């Protein structure tokens, strides 16, 4: 992920040249065009997250930059909002502040094509005040990351953890969660990082993501209707279980 918050607003004067700055969105487009020429393993196109703070001068253009289908195709985009901004929106703001207008644009864009997303930066940094602040996330937004930090992700196939009687095999699920955690931690040691800074930060914080897949198939095997109360309760119980097992294993 990239935070474009330090890029000066479009049209502001660059002191060293006397020329107007291109702005955050033009730099975002430049990055997207460059990444379009790079693939992962020769097949998968590059993916990134572009983040801009809610108070940046280019925020309106940023919110609208993907409304045209096919533009900036190699980035998801998210607006970094603060607790103060949300407080003002929830509790009413001055009509002339412009905040409600910006908020309405975010909501409209999310309704039209799912972008921009929202990152609650104060919440993200609430437990990380002793180290450098987090400004961005990985491409899908599930893992907030510091500069040069990386996170290894893996998923447990839930459908493979339903026994022949149509019940969750909790013991087998626990074993898989423990194995997944160890596996991902070993990947940090064994994988090759593109630059030394990434390797150093990854081994410093050792972030991993133990996720799941196959939830819908699990429901089919268990005879649960998707979206039912039973299905929602199952999802909550499974994730609490995987989380608890993973946390306990990480302390050993």
Where is each model-derived feature located?
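Gly/Pro-rich turn-and-neighbor structural signature
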Residues: 60, 91-109, 113-118, 238-252
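Extended, well-ordered alpha-helical scaffold/bundle regions in very large, multi-domain proteins
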Residues: 197, 204-252
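A short alpha->loop->secondary-structure connector
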Residues: 67-75
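Function-dense linear segments that define catalytic or interfacial modules
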Residues: 1-16, 24-27, 37-41, 110-202, ...
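Terminal amphipathic helices with adjacent charged low-complexity linkers/tails
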Residues: 64, 77-90, 125-149, 208-212, ...
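Short active-site loop/helix that positions an aromatic residue
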Residues: 59-68
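Acidic, glycine-rich active-site loops and adjacent beta-strand->loop/helix elements
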Residues: 6-11, 55-59, 124-125, 238-242
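Glycine-rich and small/hydrophobic secondary-structure elements
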Residues: 18-36, 230-247
């Amino acid at each position: 992920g990239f935070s474009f918050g330090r890029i000066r607003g479009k049209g502001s004067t660059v002191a060293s040249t006397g020329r107007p700055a291109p702005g955050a969105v033009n730099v975002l487009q430049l990055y997207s065009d460059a990444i379009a020429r790079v693939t992962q393993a020769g097949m998968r196109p590059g993916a990134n997250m572009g983040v801009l703070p809610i108070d940046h001068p280019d925020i309106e253009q940023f919110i609208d930059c993907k409304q045209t289908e096919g533009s900036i195709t190699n980035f998801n985009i998210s607006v970094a909002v603060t607790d103060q901004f949300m407080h003002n929106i929830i509790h009413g703001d001055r009509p002339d502040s412009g905040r409600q207008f910006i908020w309405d644009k975010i909501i409209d864009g999310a309704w039209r094509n799912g972008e921009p997303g929202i990152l609650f930066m104060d919440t993200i940094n609430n437990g990380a005040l002793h180290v450098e602040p987090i400004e961005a996330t990985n491409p899908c937004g599930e893992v907030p990351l510091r500069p040069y930090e990386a996170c290894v992700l893996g998923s447990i196939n839930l459908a493979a953890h339903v026994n022949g009687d149509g019940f969750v095999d909790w013991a087998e699920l626990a074993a898989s969660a423990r194995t997944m955690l160890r596996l991902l931690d070993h990947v940090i040691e064994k994988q090759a990082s593109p630059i030394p800074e990434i390797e150093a930060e990854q081994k410093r914080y050792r972030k991993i993501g133990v996720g799941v897949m196959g939830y819908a198939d699990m429901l089919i095997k268990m005879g649960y209707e998707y979206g039912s109360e039973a299905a929602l309760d199952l999802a909550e119980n499974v994730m609490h279980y995987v989380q608890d097992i993973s946390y306990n294993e990480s302390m050993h």
